[in-house]
Amino acid sequence: MNTLIVNSHPDFSNPYSFTTILQEKFIELYNEHFPNHQLSILNLYDCVLPEITKEVLLSIWSKQRKGLELTADEIVQAKISKDLLEQFKSHHRIVFVSPMHNYNVTARAKTYIDNIFIAGETFKYTENGSVGLMTDDYRLLMLESAGSIYSKGQYSPYEFPVHYLKAIFKDFMAFDDFCVVRAEGTDILDRQVVLDKMNQDLREAFEAFYSKE
């Protein structure tokens, strides 16, 4: 099963980060179950991401709609954006690695989504509203780290990264499934308690992520 890991942590190689640990545990499970397959990994803070600015994506999209010629730099940026979209669509399992920063996804996570949430590609507009186009058994597993507890209790309404990604991928793109595994309470709980719960949840989610049902 083609699987793409999208890591949105600015410090993606930090071995002490719970986000990194989550990703490494997922990779261990993947290698156990699919020894003959290779993961694709995209580190958002180690690649070029075209941004929605007047000079880049807004200009490119406007010219493409009007059939106008792109500048040399716009051609490069447009190809990068297209390659990101094609890479995304070619993987039916997406693992989105995301720390919670100020109750939200990181800036580059949003920029990445701007390059793949494209009308006519991953969703379309109709008279009755938008309709998702990612209907061929696409699934997303979100690996989230957070300093407090957001899966339940008084802070659960503020788990905006989960709400946002679920809306984009499941509600608007029509992914078949969206699941979250958390390393939460990292600032208030014993480290081993966090890791034990995380590992248990990850194993359960992994089985469902690759189930044939």
Curated annotation (Swiss-Prot):
It comes from the Bacteria. Disulfide bonds: none annotated. It catalyses: 2 a quinone + NADH + H(+) = 2 a 1,4-benzosemiquinone + NAD(+); N,N-dimethyl-1,4-phenylenediamine + anthranilate + 2 NAD(+) = 2-(4-dimethylaminophenyl)diazenylbenzoate + 2 NADH + 2 H(+). Binds 1 FMN per subunit. Its cofactor is FMN. HAMAP family: Azoreductase_type1. This is FMN-dependent NADH:quinone oxidoreductase. It comes from Streptococcus agalactiae serotype V (strain ATCC BAA-611 / 2603 V/R).
